[in-house]
């Protein structure tokens, strides 16, 4: 059977051609350095996520439901299938909320790095191939996520499970050595696996979805690449077609979205979170820590706290939650963040878990948030 080639020049074909032909030698020194940092950072976050309830549950599920000897679980020692390891390690890497953060592409490493490590281990690939695959994945999400970011936000759609899946498929395709045609089908097939909403921010603490979405993306990226390698085909218009991703999750396609492909490396632009929790509270955390440099005031003497911020940091309203019911909700809340940092000096997982201590809780209603 002869495969139908991907349509030349459309969005899927252009991204696929770029990824299939990208080499390690094409990358800038900063991109290579940042790739190393991203891998180490993700390993660290996964190590921290491993002993938690969700980390253990994910590891136990992967080894029970997907038994195999293809790849390792981080900090665990047990082995499972490639898909099982990528899924479980991605869940662990996401759980602490300390994964990387790109200004427009969001959190990417928790999806791509566990996938790359699992496939790299299984295929006995070298570090240069892994770095190249990560760069291709980041560039894919850089061509897609900025175009849909605002519409997704309004609709409550989740970036990790959606554009994260598309990026994961390209990273998997590079690691499997797919040619342009197979790469195009990989990306196209992954579009219909992109999923997820952010309802978990309202039901935080009552569900595990936030972290499972990273696992879905890592697993589905591998699945799409394997399907394409086996001969399955995806719709050539998966991105820019009449019912493609750009319109389904955004406002439609504009060729300008692809201008960055081959001209910049999104991986080199990603950053690392100095604090846990939602990155929209981090400016507030930094400002509070700066105030504390002149000495910590007695908490009983505080009568009011004002936070001047920007629209994205206080909308939707879960970001200004004065009555969080659990640690998950507390991690998104500006009033809680400033209260915790005033009391404890930092904003790591163990600090967020102390959100409900009486002297900290007294501060919550004293906070006014405004633009």
Report each predicted region and the residues it spans.
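Terminal-appendage/accessory-domain detector
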Residues: 1-106, 205-219, 226-371
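Aromatic-lined, polymer-binding surfaces characteristic
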Residues: 140-166, 214
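Hydrophobic alpha-helical hairpins/lids featuring a short glycine-rich hinge
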Residues: 90-146
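Well-ordered alpha-helical scaffold segments within catalytic/enzyme domains
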Residues: 49, 116-123, 169-176, 224-228, ...
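Flexible glycine/proline-rich, aromatic-decorated loop/lid segments
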Residues: 189-198
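Structured all-alpha helical bundle cores of eukaryotic regulatory proteins
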Residues: 152-155, 160-163, 183, 190, ...
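Well-ordered alpha-helical segments within folded domains of soluble proteins
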Residues: 109-117, 162-171, 218-223, 283, ...
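Structural helix-adjacent loops and short alpha-helical linkers that scaffold large soluble proteins
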Residues: 122-134, 177-184, 233-237
């Amino acid at each position: 059977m002869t495969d139908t080639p991907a349509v030349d020049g459309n969005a899927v074909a252009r991204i696929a051609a770029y990824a299939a032909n990208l080499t390690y030698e094409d990358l800038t020194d900063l991109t290579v350095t940042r790739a190393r940092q991203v891998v180490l950072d993700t390993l660290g976050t996964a190590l921290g996520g491993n002993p938690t309830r969700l980390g253990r549950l994910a590891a136990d599920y992967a080894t029970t439901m997907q038994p195999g000897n293809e790849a390792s679980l981080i900090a665990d020692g047990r082995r499972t299938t490639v898909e099982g390891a990528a899924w479980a390690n991605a869940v662990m890497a996401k759980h602490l909320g300390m994964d990387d953060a790109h200004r427009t592409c969001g959190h990417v490493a928790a999806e791509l790095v566990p996938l790359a490590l699992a496939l790299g281990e299984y295929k006995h690939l070298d570090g240069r191939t892994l770095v190249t695959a990560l760069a291709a994945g980041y560039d894919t999400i850089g061509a897609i996520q900025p175009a849909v970011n605002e519409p997704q936000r309004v609709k409550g759609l989740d970036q990790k499970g959606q554009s994260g899946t598309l990026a994961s498929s390209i990273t998997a395709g590079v690691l499997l050595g797919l040619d342009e045609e197979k790469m195009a089908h990989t990306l196209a097939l992954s579009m219909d696996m992109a999923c997820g909403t952010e309802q978990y921010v309202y039901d935080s603490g009552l569900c595990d979805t936030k972290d499972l979405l990273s696992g879905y993306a890592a697993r589905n990226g591998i699945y799409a690449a394997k399907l394409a390698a086996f001969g399955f085909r995806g719709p050539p218009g998966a991105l820019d077609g009449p019912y493609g991703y750009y319109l389904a999750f955004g406002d439609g396609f504009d060729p300008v979205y692809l201008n960055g492909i081959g001209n910049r490396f999104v991986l080199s632009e990603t950053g690392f979170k100095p604090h846990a929790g939602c990155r929209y509270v981090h400016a507030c955390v930094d400002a509070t820590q700066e105030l504390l440099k002149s000495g910590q005031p007695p908490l009983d003497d505080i009568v009011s706290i004002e936070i001047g911020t920007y629209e994205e940091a206080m909308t939707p309203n879960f970001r200004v939650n004065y009555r969080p019911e659990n640690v998950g909700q507390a991690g998104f809340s500006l009033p809680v963040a400033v209260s915790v940092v005033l009391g404890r000096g930092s904003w790591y997982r163990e600090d967020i878990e102390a959100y409900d201590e009486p002297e900290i809780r007294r501060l919550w209603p004293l906070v006014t948030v405004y633009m």
